[in-house]
Amino acid sequence: MVGRLQGKVALITGGTSGIGEATVELFVAEGAKVLIVGRNADKGRTMVSALGDAVRFFQADVRHEDQIAAAVADAAATFGRLDILFNNAGGGTTGGVTDFTAEQLDDAVSLLLGSALYGMKHAAPVMKAQGWGSIINNSSVAALRTHMGGYLYSIAKAGVTQATKLAGMELGRHGVTVNCISPGGIATPIFFGGSDRAAAMAEGHLEASMAKLERNLAKATPIQKSGLPRDIAAAALFLASDEGHYVNCHDFVVDAGMTAAGRNNFEAVA
């Protein structure tokens, strides 16, 4: 089925790489107009050149509320509406209970949690005025189980999951659904920012490290397959489409059974 987002307008943060890039490409293929939000202007221009008039790039750092507000305003002004918000931007964090810095804490909270809160804050009025909208937040299995992510990362993502449910309760009466996706082991370069061990694994050998990551992630799931960005993009497509209209306040876990498999399987990843 093609055209599941025909006539819809989406804003996707972190849209120039990994899950975000895959989602932009899928949404465009399904008929959407997309505002790509990200910091990498060169990559943004490349994507606009490749995808044409269906997309527009807006350079922004989602850790700052004024920049998110400007992106939402740009989407509404350019396309005349905003049907879908995918708060996808994120990154890995390091540090444990006793060895994180104030800067690391601020960065984790502002990037992983604050960006989603600001996105919802500024998109919600536009969607409420329309009487419809779909907000999707990118959370993580690290919000559900221990040993699935770093200390600060896991805490921030748990906040994203809870904020999703609270926002869905508040906005549902206005025709706006709010859901989150909790990816399991998805093979993207962003993985290597999640721990010192993982970063060392990738240093200077990203292509080989990605191949190794995919093999190791496959071992952590019952179906023996690594997740790829397009798997999360497909979940976002369902939630954003009319087919997902009855889903609200839901945490859509896309992990091939990783959380069921448990700690020992995941610890083999890196």
Regions of interest found by a model, annotated:
Residues 120, 156, 164:
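Active-site helix of classical SDR
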